[in-house]
Regions:
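N-terminal interaction/assembly modules
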Residues: 1-87, 110, 135-146
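N-terminal positioning helix adjacent to the helix-turn-helix/winged-helix DNA-binding module
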Residues: 78-81, 92-94, 125
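DNA major-groove recognition helices of helix-turn-helix
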Residues: 82, 122-136
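Short amphipathic alpha helix immediately N-terminal
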Residues: 89-104
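Hydrophobic positions on the alpha-helical face of helix-turn-helix-like DNA-binding modules
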Residues: 98, 111-112
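The short coil/loop that forms the "turn" connecting the two helices of the helix-turn-helix
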Residues: 116-117
Length: 146
């Protein structure tokens, strides 16, 4: 993997954690909604499939809540590390481009609009920022087998 691709992959970690958190929260909402509004079959026949048993419900909620807590922890540690590395860049424009792209998740045109430049300039700043960004040694060793 090329060095710039490796850096992009590293920077995208934060957005990946944000997406996972959103998905887990949506799953929790769905499970809670299903429990609050169970489907009812009005066919006049008795149904004995344990609607009063909350252990499965509680277990699935507990598992997802633990996963959510862990993912939030990973998001925070990822944010702290990535933002610290971005802040080490000398150029404020390079810092802005990386922050807006990889922390805020903005598209190129949104970054250009926010910073008052054309997209071509934003891509140039992005390339320079990636060249100046330093990755942790363990990431480089893991990816490149050094």
């Amino acid at each position: 993997m090329a060095e710039n691709e490796q850096k992009k992959s590293y920077l995208y970690q934060y957005r990946t954690h944000v997406r996972r958190i959103n998905r887990i929260e949506a799953e929790l909402d769905e499970i809670r909604a299903m429990k609050m509004h169970p489907s009812v079959v009005n066919d006049g026949m008795p149904h004995g499939y344990g609607q009063n048993d909350l252990s499965g419900y509680a277990s699935s909620l507990d598992g997802l809540e633990r996963e959510l807590l862990h993912e939030r922890y990973l998001r925070i540690t990822s944010y702290m590390d990535i933002s610290r590395r971005i802040k080490r860049l000398r150029s404020e424009r390079e810092r802005d481009v990386l922050f807006y792209r990889y922390i805020k998740g903005m598209d190129w045109w949104e970054i250009a609009d926010r910073m008052g430049y054309c997209e071509r300039h934003i891509h140039r700043y992005h390339g320079k920022a990636l060249a100046h960004l330093e990755l942790p040694k363990d990431v480089m060793e893991c990816q490149w087998g050094k």
